[in-house]
Swiss-Prot record:
Organism of origin: Glycine max
Catalytic activity reported: a 4'-hydroxyflavanone + S-adenosyl-L-methionine = a 4'-methoxyflavanone + S-adenosyl-L-homocysteine + H(+)
The name this protein goes by in its record: Flavonoid 4'-O-methyltransferase
Enzyme Commission no: 2.1.1.231
Lineage: Eukaryota, Viridiplantae, Streptophyta, Embryophyta, Tracheophyta
Taxonomy, superkingdom: Eukaryota
């Protein structure tokens, strides 16, 4: 008869394992809580309350018009979100509890320039969420991605055929690009000496516009899928071009790849990088490729950052057959694509800036 204590473990260890198991079993509630507060505009309500002052629970449920029969449940949701760092519980008038925004929930204020609310709406969209229910089936199917198994078509084909999903995706990528405005303030050196740059896969041009505003003399071109840029207009130093990065990338002093390469497997990345090398090979002496992407480093990163990067790797691998990479993976790609050297610099909390030289 097997021992009730697995492999001789202490009862305390087993109960710790149970707690970890249950935490992850209920982990899906985390993202649903985010969706709930974004759909109800709770960050916006707190942001606009008395010029951003904390809001009491009674004031919040009154604005939300929550029935008395559901106030306890709503309070549980708010308490859980506060515990996870999305709200701060403070004491105001006569020691009454109130909710204030944190750095995380400020990013979900829809009226904010740095709002990531569209990212929440995109990731928790039914097609994206539903695909994960097909993991078991995916293992034994020929299709490389759970997205393909779930919807019967590759991600990029689906996004081109579904206007609503395409719009949600582009809005999510655009709001993520706005965050770069903060990072680029400390990275002006990246663009010094350049006269032209191509933002490959640059979406609706948010990143390119940020660069153009910071460097008015720098000519910037956005290369994107034709259906994304067909109705977009440029400016004096910004142009939009519909094309295919797997076929040809316009000539420039530099090529920018922001969160592009993690979408693709190594063979596809090789094709993109080879085209980048061709694009920057000319008379310019400053030719380089600028990659903004994830570099996994489990030995140096904080646990929370590592967990995010590994989760992103799972997401990219299963949804579109993409990949988050360690430095040795990046080096192998760069060298095999014909580049001679590279330099990795910190960029944001989880992203790195990599300069690659031919």
């Amino acid at each position: 008869m097997a021992s009730p204590l697995n492999n001789g473990r202490k009862a305390s260890e087993i109960f710790q394992g149970q707690a970890l198991l249950y935490k992850h079993l209920l982990g899906f509630i985390d993202s649903k809580c985010l969706k709930w507060m974004v759909e109800l505009d709770i960050p916006d309500i707190i942001h606009s309350h008395s010029h951003g002052q904390p809001i009491t629970f009674s004031e919040l449920v009154s604005i939300l018009q929550v029935p008395p029969t559901k106030t306890r449940q709503v309070q549980s949701l708010m308490r859980y979100l506060a515990h996870n760092g999305f709200f701060e519980i403070v004491r105001i008038h006569d020691n009454i509890e109130a909710y204030a925004l944190t750095a995380a929930s400020e990013l979900l204020v829809k009226s904010s320039e740095l709002s990531l609310a569209p990212m929440v709406e995109y990731f928790l969209e039914p097609n994206c969420q539903g695909a994960w229910n097909q993991l078991k089936r995916w293992v034994h199917e020929e299709d490389l991605t759970v997205f393909g198994v779930s919807l019967g078509t590759p991600f990029w084909d689906f996004i081109n055929k579904d206007p609503a999903y395409n719009k949600s995706f582009n809005e999510a990528m655009a709001c993520d690009s706005q965050m770069l405005n903060l990072a680029f303030r400390d990275c002006n050196w990246v663009f010094e000496g350049l006269e032209s740059i191509v933002d490959v896969g640059g979406g609706t041009g948010i990143t390119a516009k940020i660069i153009c505003e910071a460097f008015p003399k720098l000519k910037c071109m956005v290369l994107e899928r034709p259906n994304v840029v067909e109705n977009l207009s440029g400016s004096n130093n910004l142009t939009f071009v519909g094309g295919d990065m797997f076929k040809c990338i316009p000539k420039a002093d530099a090529v920018l790849l922001k969160l592009v390469l993690h979408n693709w497997n190594d063979n596809d990345c090789m094709k993109i990088l080879e085209n980048c090398k061709e694009a920057i090979s000319g008379e310019s002496k400053t030719g380089k490729v600028v990659v903004i992407d994830t570099v996994i480093n489990e030995n140096k990163d904080e646990r929370q950052v590592t967990e995010l990067k590994l989760l992103m790797d799972v997401h990219m691998a299963c949804i579109i057959n993409g990949k988050e990479r360690k430095e040795e993976d990046w080096k192998k790609l760069f060298m095999e694509a014909g580049f001679q050297s590279y330099k990795i610099s910190p960029f944001t909390g989880y992203l790195s800036l990599i300069e690659i030289y031919p």
